[in-house]
């Protein structure tokens, strides 16, 4: 289970995949349910470990040229590019989780199972406020991200306030690990 895409997620996954490979891994399930996202570069790192080299993983487009980027899988050694793969998502899966699940789906790398994801397809830059950055942070949206096939994950937010937007995202959601009859 990946809870959040933090600065060490790619490294932690690499260690876990190596241990699973050594133990005879035959298939892989990545649980991204209730993962609200995190760092774009860590989502790319995760994909780079499970997708063959040379593939477009995600791309970003913004109003300024520096926000436009294509992210591709590298030639790094991998241990988990051939095993059957399932990625679990739900309404709480957002942003970096949707980058991973979207690429897995678009590249036909595995099966994505669960409910619709949250729909946050925005790239944000973090700006520290105050002297030494200790008076808070401002998240500035600089781009939108697109899956390899060109899908924009971002849900429409025109004319909605923050609370309506959130409530809509979780409408009809099923609690994690629930058994539905």
Predicted regions and their residues:
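C-terminal "post-core" interaction segments
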Residues: 1-181
């Amino acid at each position: 289970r990946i809870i959040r895409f933090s600065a060490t997620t790619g490294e932690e996954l690499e260690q876990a995949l190596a241990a699973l490979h050594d133990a005879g891994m035959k298939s892989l399930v990545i649980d991204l349910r209730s993962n609200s996202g995190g760092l774009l570069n860590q989502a790319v790192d995760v994909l780079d470990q499970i997708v063959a080299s040379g593939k477009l993983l995600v791309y970003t487009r913004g109003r300024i040229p520096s926000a436009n980027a294509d992210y591709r899988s590298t030639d790094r050694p991998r241990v988990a590019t051939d095993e059957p793969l399932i990625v679990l998502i739900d309404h709480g899966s957002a942003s970096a989780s949707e980058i991973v699940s979207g690429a897995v789906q678009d590249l036909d790398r595995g099966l994505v199972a669960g409910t619709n994801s949250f729909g946050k397809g925005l790239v944000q830059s973090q700006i520290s406020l105050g002297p030494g950055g200790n008076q808070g942070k401002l998240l500035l949206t600089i781009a939108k991200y697109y899956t390899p096939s060109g899908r924009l994950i971002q849900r429409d937010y025109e004319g909605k306030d923050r609370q309506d937007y959130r409530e809509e995202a979780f409408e009809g959601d099923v609690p994690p690990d629930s058994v539905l009859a």
